[in-house]
Amino acid sequence: MKKSIVVLFSAVLPFAVFADDAKELVSKLDVMQGIKANFSQKVTDQNGKLIQEGSGVIAMHQPDAFYWHLTAPDESLIVAKDNSVWVYNPFAEEVSILDMEDILKASPMALLVHRDEKRWNEYQIDRKGSCFDITPRQGVESAVDTVSVCFANNTLSDIRLTDAQGSTSHFSLSEQAAVTDADESLFQFQIPDGVSIDDQRRQ
């Protein structure tokens, strides 16, 4: 479970520390600040064979706020805020709680909402058309080989994650809108009554 959460995850910093492609990505994220959208997901194996399809809602807001609600085929929920990440499986009636730091170490996806110069410098960023590939530099451990984020003008439109086994998760976004004050409750996870709690945070 923890590995799948790490694969799913991925700032705005002083421009002086970035190469040109990274500067441009940071600028687009700076303009965006926060986004809420519906998504459709397709997961394919290394041979391009479709493994799974899904849909749900995603929201991101800087700094360090992330919401991912898979509604089909099976419901699951991930909420990240500040230093903690909550992973809720309604079918299993279980909540796992992780340190945000563990997610940041393992996935470039977290860069989209995190302000950490050290983390940004661990990744190579290359523009390819309207997309930006985020790749761990040599020696950086990551469950994800590449995260590609694509924009239509200044609106985030697609996220593609490729893992070490060659599997690809493609999230196509629709009905994008700015995060408003009314959406802030998305990032405040309330643990349901009666569920099992697996708190893996370092105290």
Curated annotation (Swiss-Prot):
- Keyword Protein transport on this protein? yes
Q: Name one Pfam family in it.
A: LolA
Principal localisation = periplasm
List locations, semicolon-separated: Periplasm
Q: Name one GO biological process term.
A: lipoprotein transport
Q: Name one GO cellular component term.
A: outer membrane-bounded periplasmic space
Keyword Signal appears in the UniProt entry: yes
Task: Tell me the first and last residues of the signal peptide.
Answer: 1-19
Alphabetical UniProt keywords: Chaperone, Periplasm, Protein transport, Signal, Transport
Which CDD domains is this protein grouped with?
LolA
The record ties this protein, via SUPFAM superfamilies, to: Prokaryotic lipoproteins and lipoprotein localization factors (SSF89392)
Against HAMAP family, the record matches this protein to: LolA (MF_00240)
Q: Which family does it belong to?
A: Belongs to the LolA family.
> Could you tell me what this protein does?
Participates in the translocation of lipoproteins from the inner membrane to the outer membrane. Only forms a complex with a lipoprotein if the residue after the N-terminal Cys is not an aspartate (The Asp acts as a targeting signal to indicate that the lipoprotein should stay in the inner membrane).
On subunit structure and binding partners, the annotation says: Monomer.
This protein is called Outer-membrane lipoprotein carrier protein
Which species? Answer: Shewanella amazonensis (strain ATCC BAA-1098 / SB2B)
